[in-house]
Amino acid sequence: MYSLMGVFTALITPFKDDFSIDENAFCHLIEEQISNNIHGLVPCGTTAECPTLSFEEYCKVIELCVKITNKRVPIIAGSSSNSTQEAIKRTLYVQSLNVDAALVVVPYYNRPSDEGIYQHFKAVHDATNLPIIAYNIPNRSAIDASDALLARILSLPRIIGLKDSTGDVSRPLNLKLLLNKEVVLFSGDDSTCLGFYAQSGSGGRTGCISVVSNVIPKIHADMHNAFLANNMKEAMNANLSVFKLAKALFCQSSPAPTKYAMSLIKNISPAVRLPLVELTQENKLKVEKTLKELKLI
């Protein structure tokens, strides 16, 4: 298995104007990511608009990613659901495709208790044989799992890491105080990921599952590489670009701003599926302004 660390792009799912999946654009996006030295890929996460994909479409996206990637970089496949049985079904499916790990979110909408959240992860863990990255994203799930709960979840043998999207850079240190094993800690917040790396330590078991790297994969990957090489000046220069773009790409519900940016620089349709909608004119101008400042258009 690959070492799971570094910048993993939370891939968008490109759509055609009729809202069907644009398979050619998706395959081209993967090639472009790999050619820009991205460390890994995450299909069917939040940025993929996964809740709007049918199960058949979900399977197709994962299959395409596995086929085109062809083991050149590791894949962490999203297999989340607020239904435990559906999460098990999806995790078993991605396991059958020999991906490197599954990304499983804290269950959304149901608002389970801490015990219910733990039992959800334990059930997925016990029903499968794949390494699992737990995913905490309170803006989407309405629950911010506590450090104690996350440490309990991470104590399960094959739950090997965490993606935390809170932007709380104290979380890596808090978890280190509670855990008796080494885990990989991914930031899910582009704006604070460099600080998250620093708090995770210099050993390299850290990274970012990124929205921004859809647009600037090389800059984002170079930032992580510079951090590991202890080149803080280079890392901080790259971080400024990541931070500026992150602010623009979250001006409206994600991934609509990212898709609009990619329509300007990568010839990918800005189409998103309802209930998401394309950017307002005001927000289009915000994205365009940032892309111009970064000399991307």
Swiss-Prot record:
Active-site residues, as the UniProt record annotates them: Y135 (proton donor/acceptor), K163 (schiff-base intermediate with substrate)
According to the UniProt entry, what is the EC number of this protein? Answer: 4.3.3.7
> CDD domains, from UniProt?
DHDPS
EC top class, in one word? Answer: lyase
Q: Please report the name of this protein according to its UniProt entry.
A: 4-hydroxy-tetrahydrodipicolinate synthase
Residues carrying the site annotation Part of a proton relay during catalysis? T46, Y109
Q: Which cysteines are joined by disulfide bonds?
A: none
Q: Where in the cell is it found?
A: Cytoplasm
Pathway(s) where this gene product acts: Amino-acid biosynthesis; L-lysine biosynthesis via DAP pathway; (S)-tetrahydrodipicolinate from L-aspartate: step 3/4
| Subunit structure comment from the entry | Homotetramer; dimer of dimers.
Give GO BP annotations, semicolon-separated. Answer: diaminopimelate biosynthetic process; lysine biosynthetic process via diaminopimelate
Q: Which stretches are transmembrane?
A: none
**Which GO MF terms are attached to this record?**
4-hydroxy-tetrahydrodipicolinate synthase activity
Keyword field = Amino-acid biosynthesis, Cytoplasm, Diaminopimelate biosynthesis, Lyase, Lysine biosynthesis, Schiff base
Which positions are annotated as binding pyruvate? Answer: T47, I209
Note whether Cytoplasm occurs among the keywords.
Answer: yes
Where does this protein chiefly localize?
Answer: cytoplasm
Task: Give the matching InterPro entries.
Answer: Aldolase_TIM, DapA, DapA-like
Organism of provenance: Ehrlichia chaffeensis (strain ATCC CRL-10679 / Arkansas)
In terms of SMART domains, this protein maps to: DHDPS
Q: Which family, according to UniProt? A: Belongs to the DapA family.
Q: What does this protein do?
A: Catalyzes the condensation of (S)-aspartate-beta-semialdehyde [(S)-ASA] and pyruvate to 4-hydroxy-tetrahydrodipicolinate (HTPA).
Cited HAMAP family:
DapA
Per its record, the protein catalyses:
L-aspartate 4-semialdehyde + pyruvate = (2S,4S)-4-hydroxy-2,3,4,5-tetrahydrodipicolinate + H2O + H(+)
Annotated Gene Ontology cellular components are:
cytoplasm
Is this entry keyworded Lyase? yes
